[in-house]
Amino acid sequence: MITIRKAKERGPASFDWLNTWYTFSFADYHDDRYMGFRALRVINDDTIAGGGGFGTHPHRDMEIITYVLSGALEHKDSMGNGRVIRPGEVQYMAAGTGVAHSEFNPSPTEPVHLLQIWILPDRRGAKPTYAEKSFAQAAPGKLYLAASKSGRDGSIPINQDVDVFVGKLGAGDKISHTLKPSRYVWLQVAEGEMDLNGLPLKAGDGAALSGETSVQLAGKSAAQVILFDLN
């Protein structure tokens, strides 16, 4: 079964420095139908204005992934990390026993567009960690493993049984992903247009897959997608 979550159906929020769309219930937006999907809890589609950002704030027991689509994001945290994340780069932070961080747009004029993702960990009280992985030079027509429980194939090790893939497609590109029994998929279209198992999707759309044996993607334009393969 495939259930489509259209971009325009998400929860919108707007502030002086931030325009965002919530795929799942978050902050003041609540929808009992969309409290998360398996261990996936948050997908926020954020556009932060020049000079804007999230001031220092704490987290505990959450796996936090940021994927930058355009612009740049300056990260600082209580573990001593200070980095500027650019398009095509994945940032990972395990909050574990507790971490504080800030995320700001260092440009005074150019917005930064990103996806902020939260995944529930499989255990509480893990050691806070930080990692990055770049797919800026990755060729289209393939899924790239960004994070996994085992850290296999050079992916970032995370505290949950989920494989997180970054996919890039051009017009006419086809990507296939085989699902093992009792696995689930959430697919989030970050940019562009594509077909998922014959169903049309556009930027901002999401899809929940259960009971499927494979994911078949066909690019209609230059596109990016995040695929979560969950237990």
PLM region spans:
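Jelly-roll (double-stranded beta-helix
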Residues: M1-N231
